[in-house]
């Protein structure tokens, strides 16, 4: 792949949804360019309906752009693939499989040796704090434990990029903060050279700043990246970073950016 861009590269990406009946088509994404380096953790922040999830679904290969293209490590994205792992806000575990079986599902579908499946599954059960819950069914789990399992399942497949679409949005505040810390702990367990690339969609400014080393702010629909804010807070991070002046300053800057777009969305 000599000469090809590494990491995630988005160029001229647009998405228009056809209108229903006589309604006009809806432009969800204006031409969008974006680069995410290998191992980078990027949060995407924006008002409801701005195209955040649409952008993520196109990167995942779950939706097709109207224009432009996406490449991951030099390969054009046209369909879903094991090089991209996704975790949704809604609970997406297979209800007929146990925690262990859910985590192992993708590995087994790829036909990997049973010894490798067991080793990898156990590794991510341990990393995500699921010891003692391996044989539970999804209906027996809290929302937080279901999302731990979904995260473990995505990571077990060893994707090149992890795509998270408001994965903690349905959780209570305390559980949400614990899951944020868990995600950073799992992500930071690898060396800087081998860390997963992460694209994380959220409505929550605190969450965006706490997790990422860069936050992108999207405009009201039709969406585009209107601002890019580096987050120079050192890793590893825990909840105490939220009490610092640097965190407050970043939050205030993002609040100013996002309030303008939320106001536009409300008046649209």
For the regions a language model picked out, list residue spans one by one.
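Hydrophobic anchor residue at the start of the ABC signature
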Residues: 87, 151
